[in-house]
């Protein structure tokens, strides 16, 4: 079976590797990925995508594009004569491309569809406090993330999972699901299930605005929000006029002695080893953070170097 594989980030790499390992059944004739990104360091070579890096290590042909709607790209895919197109964390494909594959094109999506359709399903599942998520393979159609489902696999979200750790778990589960899907297609034994649109939910693209911490929330919700955005792009707030990224926080369970002014959302309270922030129903302890211009630090290290000049005024995170 001739396969064109399309993907860009780390999430897609295990799927590419699993397909390549089964070369007695599958032949990857082309790997499509995004273009190399320029590095910040002067005179440094552009940085290849994780998928390109893996493909080159596997000795596979690579085509780079940031415009899957171009006529040139469609011609390249057509010339590859794919039986199947496999997509994992790539751009939106037009019908002119995904219809080229003789046996169809399918996508690996990091949720249990129709839940969390969209660009950031891993993040939003954690942010919304889900205990279980999963991976789905489905045939592509013109409307994004709505095609008929082939296989699904549940994955438990652990209490200490952040988006990075959950993505790693889902990528491994997803790779196995991709290979299983390919075997079903190869055997002509695929059965599909239509998505129930009434059960659909959205996982919109992460932006500067929707990753900002809103302190007027409950402690548990804030901690889910923070771990759902860690380690990238990271939940953020402002401290004394500077951007503060927060990577880990936990609700405060033991009582503390509070200053007379009491608690309010965003109010900072510092003791010898903890940086506490008020919420609508309690306090959370910020455990890993990064102030603008500084490295990522644990709270104790951060507090050793932290100076707040206006001690008479409460320090608020905004």
Curated annotation (Swiss-Prot):
The lineage of its organism: Bacteria, Pseudomonadati, Chlorobiota, Chlorobiia, Chlorobiales. HAMAP family: Formyl_trans. NCBIfam families: fmt (TIGR00460). This is Methionyl-tRNA formyltransferase. The gene is fmt. It is an enzyme of class 2 (transferase). (6S)-5,6,7,8-tetrahydrofolate binds at residues 111-114. It comes from Chlorobium limicola (strain DSM 245 / NBRC 103803 / 6330). Its EC number is 2.1.2.9. It comes from the Bacteria.
């Amino acid at each position: 079976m001739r396969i064109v594989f399309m993907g860009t980030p780390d999430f897609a790499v295990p799927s590419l590797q699993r397909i390549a390992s089964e070369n007695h059944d599958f032949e990857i004739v082309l790997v499509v990925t995004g273009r190399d990104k320029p590095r910040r360091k002067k005179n440094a070579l552009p940085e290849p995508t994780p998928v390109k890096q893996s493909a080159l290590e596997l000795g596979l042909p690579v085509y780079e594009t940031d415009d899957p709607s171009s006529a040139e790209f469609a011609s390249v895919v057509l010339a590859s004569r794919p039986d199947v197109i496999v997509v994992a964390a790539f751009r939106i494909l037009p019908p002119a491309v995904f219809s080229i594959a003789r046996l169809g094109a399918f996508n690996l999506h990091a949720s249990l569809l129709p839940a969390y359709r969209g660009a950031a399903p891993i993040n939003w599942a954690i942010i919304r406090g889900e205990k279980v998520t999963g991976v789905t393979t489905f045939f592509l159609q013109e409307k994004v993330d709505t095609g008929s489902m082939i296989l699904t696999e549940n994955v438990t979200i652990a209490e200490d999972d952040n988006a990075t750790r959950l993505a790693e778990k889902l990528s491994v589960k997803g790779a196995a699901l991709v290979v299983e899907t390919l075997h079903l297609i190869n055997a002509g034994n695929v059965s599909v299930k239509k998505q129930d649109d009434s059960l659909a939910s959205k996982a919109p693209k992460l932006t500067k605005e929707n990753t900002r911490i809103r302190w007027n929330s409950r402690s548990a919700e804030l901690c889910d929000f923070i771990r759902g955005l860690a380690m990238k792009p990271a939940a953020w707030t402002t401290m004394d006029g500077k951007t503060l990224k927060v990577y880990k926080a936990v609700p405060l369970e033991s009582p503390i002695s509070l200053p007379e002014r009491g608690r309010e959302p965003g109010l900072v309270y510092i003791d010898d080893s903890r940086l506490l922030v008020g919420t609508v129903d309690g306090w959370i302890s910020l455990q890993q953070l990064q102030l603008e211009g500084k490295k990522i630090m644990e709270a104790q290290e951060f507090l050793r170097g932290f100076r707040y000049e206006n001690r008479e005024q409460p320090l608020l995170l905004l």
